[in-house]
Curated annotation (Swiss-Prot):
Residues 32-127, 715-736 are annotated as: Disordered. It is a multi-pass membrane protein. GO terms for cellular component: autophagosome; cytoplasmic vesicle membrane; endoplasmic reticulum membrane; Golgi membrane; mitochondrion; phagophore; phagophore assembly site; phagophore assembly site membrane. Homotrimer; forms a homotrimer with a central pore that forms a path between the two membrane leaflets. Belongs to the ATG9 family. Residues 1-171, 244-390, 392-479, 534-579, 601-788 are cytoplasmic. This is Autophagy-related protein 9. It comes from Yarrowia lipolytica (strain CLIB 122 / E 150) (Yeast). GO terms for molecular function: phospholipid scramblase activity. Residues 101-112 have a biased composition (Polar residues). Residues 44-58, 716-734 have a biased composition (Low complexity). Phosphorylated by ATG1. ATG1 phosphorylation is required for preautophagosome elongation.
Length: 788
């Protein structure tokens, strides 16, 4: 078996996620001939007995090899080195045969039979010594080759991560183009900044009229030794990254073949197709080719939930740790400064990278699985000490590289955003969610592109919510400033139109012409006008914030009854900050990161180790994953802290809104459950009036646009106050455990586990499942709507 697998690896090559395919796929002719001879000798010895008995137990059905006899005398001689392709999916394979075709929707399957090169006779050697690998790869059917590689994937985490990266990158050409432009951007920033700093004599600019007069001859030869060392280090790293990208092209080509041949998604369709549809096609592919399942796992089907768990395995732990406040991201300030600024928390992209390096790379092994040591309480002290050392080492490295990082980021942000702010000064006041807020708002198993889309939908209503609050003092000052600046700009502009040659070069102050002041007053006018609220804006912050929560799914219980107050507005503003403030925090975090790593995060080491151990659950076919990501509602948290804002429930409902097709194995009584797929909009669009999340919010009294209460929609006045998908537990009310009639013995993980153990023709056991709960929930909401 090993020799056959190695032989196929030599022929077809592959990426790092394929078994024995880590090489470049090119070997010497002698090595190929030796392997062909050994492989054929092993199969020819027992060919008669195997053919008579039909016993192929020594070869799996996914890699069965047929012997090829020498041509009989008088028969037409075959061309040497032509290889019969992988046998097509045949209808004569029996009742269990299945193949997959997404266009027609048929499902049949047969074992994949790989035939030998027809140029190999019983003697064992090819008739001509040629590079068989290259010739066979060009002649084998691309679809069957892609299916063979899919059957030999060894690390599904890496494979699905690469598949998702390929999807978000929008195909082979777009990914390569993006990488080329990114590498060019980095090179441009370094080379251009070096030229501006070393090749221009700024003392000569005032009396010069051409670039040659201020250009320093042979400027690069005059660079200091430290500057030269930094440039050489950069170029070495740059070319190493370039080599990595070039080497990665082969895996991208394999992934393109997987999408195009097996999922039947070409480059054009990839630009518009939604990820849930891609995930469902992957699930259909794995189900139709169960005989070629990877790793001989007992898991017979890959579901969209499994794919999301594999892609988000590491990120789910970070989402949970931020949600449970395990990570201490407080900026360590002296006591006098703490009295003024309090204890602010800071998270930047640089700190995110440090967290990934220190925590995730420590918890997970290279295969993407949780290290067994983290699952045993006896190793807590050792692991905590090791994690603390990683934080300290990261703090030291941040101090060493801080000058270079701050210089690069400053130049990058300057080149990227200067033109934007120059063309549109009002954009300086635009807002975005800061990184810490993003991790608070992110949900379990929510892929990055889905999360970004949800936040993007909330930008406009969030800005309108903040703009509603009275800013009379700011508005009065802004109107006065805009009037003064507009007056100066109007006079200078009209004068320039009357006599352009005179006024454009006319100096109002020393070395400051009319053109300079027109730009200054124009920028002041644009910024001041952006601070004046619209006169047609209706003031209703409570309804506006509830509408924002339709997208963010965030409305803490302590905000209840205070949505109109300045306190809630200020707390929301700390999450939804101005872009300029976020950029300044990114630059400041380069200097503050060492202190946060050394003083704050080192205090969280014990909690991090305990959290990983207590919130990891083993799932057959997946390995250890975060308990919250499995939507196991019956499992109580080891820390016994109630999930006040119900993040796991919201994550489950939002997941169903995206992937909402019913499980394949459901009883006939569950077929009429209205799921999200029946109201799917184009490209992952969400119908807020028909989604599961919206019905859940209405059931709990949060009608964002109408402001209706539970009594308005027909709920019993005696019913206890319910928690909402966006607010958690109402103030003074106990959380409801029966939001959608959850049984304490039922959970999503029970449903998925039982489905994996059933055959396709077997109906599930007659017991209550999550779909039954949703069915009852929809009946209630429909009755309430009819009653209203």
């Amino acid at each position: 078996m090993t020799d056959k697998s190695t032989f196929l690896s030599v022929l077809f090559g592959g990426g790092s996620v394929y078994q024995d395919l880590d090489g470049d796929g090119e070997v010497e002719d002698a090595e190929i001939l030796r392997r062909v001879e050994e492989e054929h000798a092993q199969t020819s010895d027992n060919s008669n007995s195997d053919n008579d008995s039909g016993n192929d137990s020594d070869v799996p059905t996914s890699l069965m090899v047929e012997g090829v006899q020498d041509p009989k005398p008088g028969s037409k001689r075959r061309q040497p080195h032509r290889m019969a392709t992988l046998s097509n999916l045949q209808s004569s394979a029996g009742p269990g045969a299945r193949s997959v075709s997404f266009a027609q929707g048929t499902k049949t399957q047969t074992p994949i039979r790989l035939t030998k090169p027809t140029g190999v006779a019983n003697g064992g050697l090819p008739r001509h010594k040629q590079d068989l690998g290259a010739s066979i790869r060009t002649m084998v059917d691309p679809k069957e080759l892609a299916l063979w590689k899919w059957a030999n994937v060894q690390n599904l985490d890496n494979f699905f991560a690469e598949a998702y990266m390929y999807y978000t990158g929008k195909g082979l050409v777009s990914i390569i183009l993006s990488r080329v432009l990114n590498m060019s951007t980095i090179m441009f920033v370094v080379v251009f900044s070096t030229y501006l700093g070393s090749c221009i004599d700024y003392s000569k600019i005032k009396g010069s009229r051409t670039l040659d007069e201020v250009h320093v001859k042979q400027c690069y030869a005059k660079l200091g030794s430290f500057h030269v060392f930094v440039l050489w280090t950069f170029f070495v790293l740059w070319f190493m990254k370039l080599f990595q990208y070039v080497k990665d092209i082969r895996r991208l080509v394999d992934m393109k073949s997987f999408y195009q041949e097996l999922l039947e998604i070409d480059e054009n369709e990839l630009q518009t197709i939604s990820w849930p549809q891609v995930a469902k096609r992957m699930a259909t592919l794995s189900e139709a080719n169960a005989a070629t399942q990877v790793g001989n796992s007992t898991k017979q089907r890959i579901e969209p939930h499994d794919i999301a768990n594999r892609v988000m395995r590491k990120e789910n732990y970070l989402v949970a740790m931020f949600h449970k406040r395990v990570l201490n991201m407080t900026v360590p300030l002296p006591q006098p400064l703490q009295r003024i600024f309090g204890r602010p928390q800071l998270l930047s992209r640089a700190l995110e990278w440090n967290l990934s390096l220190c925590i995730l790379d420590y918890v997970f092994n290279p295969a993407g699985q949780v290290r067994p040591m983290f699952l045993k309480s006896t190793h807590k002290q050792i692991l905590s000490t090791g994690l603390r050392r990683r934080f300290v080492f990261a703090a030291i490295m941040n101090v060493v590289f801080a000058p270079f990082i701050i210089l690069y980021l400053a130049l990058l942000y300057f080149f990227r955003y200067f033109n934007e702010y120059h063309k549109n000064p009002a954009s300086i006041g635009t807002r975005r969610y800061n990184p810490l807020a993003e991790w608070k708002l992110r949900e379990y198993n929510e892929l990055p592109h889905q999360f970004e889309r949800r936040l993007t939908l909330s930008y406009i209503p969030a800005s309108k919510y903040l703009d509603q609050f009275p800013k009379e003092k700011t508005a009065l000052v802004s109107k006065f400033v805009s009037f003064i600046a507009g007056s100066f700009a109007a006079v200078l502009g009209i004068a320039s139109l009357i006599d352009p040659e005179l006024f454009l070069m006319f100096e109002i102050s020393a070395n400051r012409t009319v053109l300079f002041y027109i730009g200054v007053f124009g920028s002041i006018l644009a910024v001041s006008r952006s601070l004046i609220p619209e006169e047609t804006l209706v003031f209703d912050p409570e309804i506006s914030l509830r509408y924002v929560a339709e997208f963010t799914h965030y409305l803490p219980p302590e905000w209840e009854g205070k949505l109109h107050t300045e306190q809630v507005k200020n707390e929301f503003s700390l999450m939804y900050e101005m872009r300029l403030i976020i950029l300044l925090k990114e630059l400041a975090s380069i200097f503050l990161a060492p202190f946060i790593l050394y003083y704050s995060l080192t205090q969280s080491c014990d909690d991090i180790v305990d959290f990983i151990r207590d919130h990891s659950v083993h799932v057959d076919g997946l390995g250890y994953v975060c308990t919250f990501a499995m939507f196991d509602f019956k499992q109580k948290s080891p820390d016994h802290q109630p999930d006040e804002d119900q993040k796991m429930l919201k994550s489950y409902l939002y997941f169903m809104d995206h992937y909402g097709d019913k499980p394949t194995n459901v009883s006939q009584t569950q077929q009429n459950v209205p799921m999200y797929s029946s109201v799917r909009l184009k490209n992952d669009g969400l119908d807020l009036n028909n989604s599961i999340m919206q019905k859940f919010q209405k059931h709990n009294g949060h009608h964002a646009l109408s402001g209706l209460t539970q009594r308005d929609v027909g709920l019993s006045p005696a019913a206890p106050t319910a928690t909402t998908a966006t607010s958690g537990t109402a103030t003074g009310a106990a959380p409801r455990r029966d939001l959608i009639n959850f049984d304490v013995d039922e959970s999503f993980i029970d449903q998925t586990t039982s489905n994996r153990d059933m055959d396709n023709d077997e109906q599930p056991k007659d017991k209550e499942r999550v779909v039954d709960m949703l069915n009852q929930f929809y009946k209630k909401t429909d009755n309430m709507n009819l009653g209203a």
